[in-house]
């Protein structure tokens, strides 16, 4: 089974980069109802053109409408869903069961994918969602390969699993840390990531909840899922390009390219982990440092005259950025290589295995031998992932407008649907009626910045008359200026009131079966 490679797009640039480097599908958010509310996200015009371009390549676009909604947001939700239906997105990624119901009842043409925010972690949860209309479930990140296999075996249900990117300390969708600590809820797309902060503990101030990044690398070939998902709607187009390129090569059988993996580390990465893929793993926290680390390239050596010597395990160049782990500091010490020397000579770049001397900036802390050094950014990598994107407007999705034009003595008229326009004039016999028809096609082919393009054009000119271009253009402007597409309103069925009678009932919530032993269920 060919697996889908699914890439993130926090903006159009990341989306185009993902498609260029081989993503089979892209997931994105709109300006509202996205669990990554602080990403740039997509407006209506962005969505229109991006979906049009992706579909021209045979790729898919999924829109994340994956926050929990409040009742007064329903009108705004319907506007967002109208856009998704109008531009024919391939699926919606949903967390709120109320949103799922709206989609089922008013937008049945849109597929439903269950967001990882639903924390689907077993066969029963997946079956329950399949029963209410979800065609795909995005699995919780915390699963082992065997647990994934069990869910993926459900007939008729697609499965999607994360393979690379940031991890949440809690289960996605169930975490209240940001909400309770800052008033900004992750389930409203506004997580402030307090889990990345330092907290006091038995080992002093450490980042006890700061997770490493997932990177399954070649393990993805073992996964029996429909779709392999890269996290990162807040990442740059460069990061998305590098991650997609890396996993595309693995899936296409071109191998696990170490150099491309190193490129990802230089663009953005925390320490990598396979998480629980091969069994429960406790080494998933980076307690000492938070944020981007980069690619480890050596350890601090001798220090003299405000310069540092070390043996690099990777090619480096002037103006690259390096970071040094400083024990006791929350963040590594980073600086740009303004000078680079090898064997006492100034060089622009140094190769792996060479001992280099670099000038430290004036604000450098006191360094000691043996501290880890990371390549945090490299000019060579920044230029390694060019990508193409279409000209603005080239793939804008527009409706086809069928037009009929009548040329008769004393009058030109044009009609489309319920709209009609006419101009008067004196029209002589045409020397070549075919040229008149060409002129009509040319005039009415100019649809400009409208929501439509010319579809079928019917021309009636029974007397073989000549019509000047100026009048044809006036006729076109008059007709096109009237055209307004009325969208068929979506109607939500009234919610039936449920009346219950009888004795009060108890609701018991427990995670231990033994608790039920002491309750009379008769």
Regions found by a protein language model. Give the residues of each.
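Alpha-helix capping/helix-boundary segments
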Residues: 98-99
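RNase H-like DDE/DDD metal-dependent nuclease/strand-transfer catalytic core used by mobile genetic elements
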Residues: 103
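Beta/alpha (TIM)-barrel catalytic core signal, keyed to glycine-rich beta->alpha loops juxtaposed to Asp/Glu
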Residues: 119
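Surface-exposed amphipathic alpha-helical tracts and adjacent flexible/coil segments at the periphery
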Residues: 1-21, 25-35, 50-51, 57-67, ...
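Aromatic- and glycine-enriched glycan-recognition loops and surfaces
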Residues: 39-48
């Amino acid at each position: 089974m060919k697996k889908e490679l699914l890439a993130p797009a926090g903006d159009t640039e990341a989306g185009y980069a993902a498609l260029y480097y081989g993503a089979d599908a892209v997931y994105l958010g709109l300006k509202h109802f996205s669990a990554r509310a602080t990403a740039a996200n997509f407006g209506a015009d962005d969505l229109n053109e991006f979906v049009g371009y992706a579909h021209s390549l045979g790729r898919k676009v999924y829109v994340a409408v994956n926050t929990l909604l409040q009742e007064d947001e329903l009108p705004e939700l319907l506007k967002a869903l109208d856009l998704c239906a109008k531009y024919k997105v391939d699926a919606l990624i949903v967390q709120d069961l109320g949103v799922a119901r709206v989609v089922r009842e008013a937008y049945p043409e849109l597929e439903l994918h269950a967001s990882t925010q639903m924390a689907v972690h077993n066969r029963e949860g997946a079956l329950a969602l399949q029963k209410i209309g979800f065609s795909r479930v995005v699995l919780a990140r915390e699963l082992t390969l065997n647990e994934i296999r069990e869910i993926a075996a459900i007939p008729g249900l697609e499965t999607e699993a994360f393979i690379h990117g940031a991890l949440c300390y809690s289960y996605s969708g169930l975490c209240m840390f940001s909400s309770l600590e800052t008033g900004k809820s992750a389930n409203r797309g506004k997580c402030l990531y307090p889990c990345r902060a330092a907290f006091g503990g038995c080992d002093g101030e450490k980042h006890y909840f700061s997770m490493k990044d997932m990177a399954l690398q070649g393990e993805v070939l073992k996964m029996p899922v429909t779709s392999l998902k890269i996290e990162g709607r807040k990442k740059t187009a460069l990061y998305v390009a590098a991650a997609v390129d890396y996993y595309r090569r693995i899936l296409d059988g071109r191998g696990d390219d170490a150099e491309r993996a190193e490129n990802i580390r230089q663009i953005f990465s925390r320490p990598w982990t396979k998480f629980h893929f091969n069994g429960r793993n406790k080494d998933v926290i980076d307690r000492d440092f938070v944020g981007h680390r980069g690619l480890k390239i050596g350890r601090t050596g001798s220090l003299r005259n405000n310069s540092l010597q070390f043996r690099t395990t990777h090619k480096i160049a002037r103006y690259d950025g390096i970071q040094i782990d400083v024990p006791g500091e929350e963040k590594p010490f980073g600086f740009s290589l303004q000078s680079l020397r090898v064997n006492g000579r100034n060089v622009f770049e140094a190769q792996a295995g060479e001992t280099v001397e670099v000038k430290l900036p004036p604000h450098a802390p006191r360094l000691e031998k043996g501290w880890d050094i990371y390549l945090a950014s490299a000019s060579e990598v920044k230029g390694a992932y060019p990508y193409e994107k279409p000209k603005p407007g080239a793939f804008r999705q527009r409706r086809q407008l069928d037009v009929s034009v009548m040329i008769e003595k004393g009058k030109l008229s044009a009609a489309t649907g319920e709209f009609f326009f006419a101009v008067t004039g004196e029209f002589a016999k045409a020397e070549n009626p075919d040229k008149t028809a060409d002129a009509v096609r040319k005039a009415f082919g100019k649809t400009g910045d409208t929501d439509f393009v010319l579809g079928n054009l019917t021309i009636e000119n029974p007397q073989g008359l000549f019509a000047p271009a100026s009048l044809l253009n006036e006729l076109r402007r008059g007709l096109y200026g009237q055209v307004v597409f009325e969208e068929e309103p979506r109607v939500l069925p009234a919610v039936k009131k449920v009346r219950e009678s009888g004795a009060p009932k108890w609701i018991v919530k427990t995670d231990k079966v033994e608790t039920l032993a002491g309750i009379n269920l008769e």
